[in-house]
Structure formats: C-alpha cells, structure tokens
A protein has these predicted regions:
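Charge-dense, low-complexity intrinsically disordered segments
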Residues: 12, 55, 59, 145
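Residues that form generic nucleotide/phosphate-binding pockets
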Residues: 36, 40, 59, 63, ...
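Residue-level marker of regulatory loop/turn positions in helix-turn-helix DNA-binding domains and
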Residues: 10, 64, 133
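Conserved SAM-binding loop
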Residues: 67-174
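N-terminal juxtadomain amphipathic helix
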Residues: 1-52
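Conserved SAM-binding loop and adjacent beta-strand
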Residues: 53-67
Length: 174
C-alpha cells in the first residue's frame, strides 16, 4: 500500500505488512527521521493556539493529560518514578509531577520540542544515556511506538528500564 505524507514532506511511502509483529512498516525507512519532527507542521511539538484546529488540539491535549494520570493511578499507587518517552513539549511530564506528585522524567529527541518544554520549566533529555536498568515504576509512550524503527528492540529496552512489577503504558493510533 502506498501513502503520501501530506503534512511535512509530500513524499510517498510504501507500507508493508509484517506478519510476525502483525503491523505495517514504512519502507524504505527514511534516512533522516529528524526532519519530519522538526517541522512547524508537526503539531505535537508545538503549543500553538493560532488556528481553530490548534486550539482544539490543545484543549483535547489538556483533557487527555488528566485522563492519562487517572489511568496510571488505577494500576500504580504511591510514589511513582515515571519516564515518558517521546515527551514532546513536556506537558505530561509536568502534569505527572504537579498533579500526581510523581518523580517524572522525559526523553524527547526534538531539540525544538525540548526548548519549548524548557520554557515551561520542564527539562527533558535528548536520549537514553544515563538511564539505569530497572529504575522506573512506569514508562509511557503516547503515540510514539509507531515512529520507532525497531519495535522489538524498543520493547526490550523499555522492559530493561522497568523495575520488577513495573508498568509500560503504550498508546498507538488505531
């Protein structure tokens, strides 16, 4: 199946079904993924309120932050050390700290998104360096896994970062 990226690059990509993992993969995988996430049109890396769509997106994001915290609290109680992978502009990291009183940390490869997070007082790391194995109670990936080149490797990595009995919360579209 061929699809077009109407948002950023206008490129055509082919989706190939992986019967082992039961998911579609983009082929060929673009060499420079960074350019897709540094675009002004990549909405999850902005806090824009310019258009009606931007305002609606920010309202939905605000609602979802509360829902995500509530969801995690159903499964984990007490002092929680949480890592948010693909933290965007840091809103979930900040919400977890301010409203749930968790110890939070975020990973975000986009320099632009990390800068926006920093403007809000949220410090995010660019990568996984300095993270110790078995050091998190909860790891979240909100619409991130579908952007990862090697899903199996990512899941194994997350598993290694979780404490025994830890919780991985992974949301993907559809």
């Amino acid at each position: 199946m061929t699809i077009k990226d109407y948002s950023v690059s206008q490129e055509d990509f082919t989706l190939v079904y992986d019967s082992v993992l039961k998911l579609y993969r983009t082929t060929p995988l673009p060499n420079d993924l960074k350019k897709y996430y540094e675009s002004e049109d990549y909405i999850s890396h902005t806090d824009s309120h310019r258009t009606l769509f931007d305002k609606l997106y920010q309202w939905v994001k605000s609602y979802n932050l509360k829902h995500k915290i509530k969801l995690i609290k159903q499964y984990k109680k007490g002092n929680i050390r949480l890592l948010d992978i693909g933290a965007g502009t840091g809103d979930f990291v900040r919400s977890g700290k301010e409203y749930a009183h968790w110890e939070t940390m975020g990973i975000e490869p986009s320099e632009k998104a990390r800068t926006k997070a920093k403007e809000k007082g949220v410090l995010l790391q660019a990568d996984f360096s300095n993270l110790l194995p078995h050091s998190f109670d909860v790891i979240t990936m909100w619409h991130v896994l579908e952007h990862v080149p090697d899903v199996t490797q990512e899941i194994q990595f997350i598993s290694n970062l979780l404490k025994e009995g830890g919780l991985a919360v992974i949301a993907v579209p559809n």
